[in-house]
Amino acid sequence: VIGTGASGAAFAWKMSKSGARVVCIEQGDYVKNNQYPKYKKNIEISALKEWNWNPNVRKNKFDYPIDNSNSPIHPLMYNSVGGSTLHYTAHTPRFHPSDFKVKTLDNISSDWPISYYDLEKFYDENDEMMKCSGINGDPANPPRSKRPLKPVSLGKDGEIIASAFDKLN
């Protein structure tokens, strides 16, 4: 498997669970826990420089320049063991069924040759593997079977903020 970002790691995990012997090849070094910006006093500066999502700004040893000047999409890339999951924010959205039919619904680009429902079982499998949490039946999300875990609690800080928002009514 070339690359141990989200896709490569999931594929390697699935293959190894089925008994396959798997080798992963990565472009970059291991990042040690104490190297992450959260352990630095200058976290804000670090996040804008050596931890920037853009390799053109970051310029780490294993980065290579990208040209996204003609694209509205700016990829989040990181060359290391774990790939772009080093920037992972635990947000795992699914495409909506309508995202697969942009030509039909919005007359732009092309429709996908598959539908959301063709991928749903793979989304479910990934959610189970990643132990995704959330609210079942949330209308802001596309249809899905039951989530593997209940929503994460707000915690003390979240409860204070929620209480303050409630007082604004």
For the regions a protein language model found, what residue spans apply to each?
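N-terminal glycine-rich phosphate/pyrophosphate-binding loop and immediately adjacent elements
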Residues: 1-104, 108, 113-117, 121
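Conserved redox-cofactor binding core of oxidoreductases
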Residues: 64, 91, 103-169
